[in-house]
Amino acid sequence: MNDLRQLRHFVALAEHGHFARAAEAVNLSQPALSRSIQALENGLGCRLLDRGPRQVSLTAHGRLVLEHARRLLDGDRALRSAVSQLDNLGSGELRLGAGPYPGARLVPRALGRFAGAHPGVRVQLAIDTWYSLHQRLLDDALELFVADVRELRDDPQLEVTPLRSWPGVIFCRPGHPLLGRRRHRLTAADLAAYPLAGTQVPAEVAQALGQLAESGQPLGIECDNFMALKALVAESDVLSMAPLDVVAEEIEAGRLALLELAPGLLSQRSAYGLVSRAGRTLSPAAEAMRGLILDEDARTPPASAR
């Protein structure tokens, strides 16, 4: 029976592609790592690697073993985390995900409170698109995530808890040329002279933006790092769109400004939700984090967001 140490060594070698780097990653000497891999190959009765002068590559057997090894190691980590958390939250692990917008305000606030209450729990936070987070949840790489749930609500594999909805806005830097046009609300033609930046959006929102694009304003810059988008807007004439909650504090402080749009030009609202696997019991850490996210979501927003 091959033990998990050999599988960890094999996964490290597959990921690094080089014995020296893999040995360093798992704190072994190169000869010891080589012996471990050979023992794994002997135990399975097949060759897992093609050894080249500069790097190693996986055989067909190696690719199959890698897929199963990752699942076994994930299961081992989940088991150890669950056992350590059974009686308290003094240790263990929480693997959490967030979309670009909830990852900019809601989740960090809840996570700060969680870390203060449970400093012994190791947290891995992934900021990604709703699509990628969905896949990672189904692969058991995440236990819980917060993201746009428009395209996830009807998935029977998921448990989705809707969160507060925020109006969508288009924002710019203070002093932007469009802010001087206070005599009328801005139309698509007014916006067309400036690039519009935003994150990857669900189909429903993309359709609405497509209607805007037909009037001359496409989504010219796509970036899933909202902090980068805000910095881009602050330093240029680029416009960006977001739910109001993630820019409300900057608007209130005068670091960003909202554009007043013509009625119906941007009617979309946020659709955040808490997502976990249906029929799965959350770990104590994930359950505690879920409660903090719900509590933070219910708190009074900044004045400019009311």
UniProtKB/Swiss-Prot annotation:
Gene3D superfamilies: 3.40.190.290, Winged helix-like DNA-binding domain superfamily/Winged helix DNA-binding domain. Signal peptide: none annotated. The keyword Lipoprotein does not apply. Residues 1-59 form the HTH lysR-type domain. Residues 19-38 bind DNA. Keywords: Activator, DNA-binding, Transcription, Transcription regulation. One of its GO terms (molecular function) is DNA-binding transcription factor activity. GO terms for cellular component: cytosol. The keyword Iron-sulfur does not apply. InterPro entries: HTH-type_LysR_regulators, LysR_subst-bd, Tscrpt_reg_HTH_LysR, WH-like_DNA-bd_sf, WH_DNA-bd_sf. Pfam families: HTH_1 (PF00126), LysR_substrate (PF03466). Coiled coil: none annotated. PANTHER family: HTH-TYPE TRANSCRIPTIONAL REGULATOR YBHD, LYSR FAMILY TRANSCRIPTIONAL REGULATOR. Belongs to the LysR transcriptional regulatory family. Activates the transcription of the sdsA gene for sodium dodecyl sulfate (SDS) degradation. This is SDS degradation transcriptional activation protein. It comes from Pseudomonas sp. (strain ATCC 19151). The lineage of its organism: Bacteria, Pseudomonadati, Pseudomonadota. The gene is sdsB.
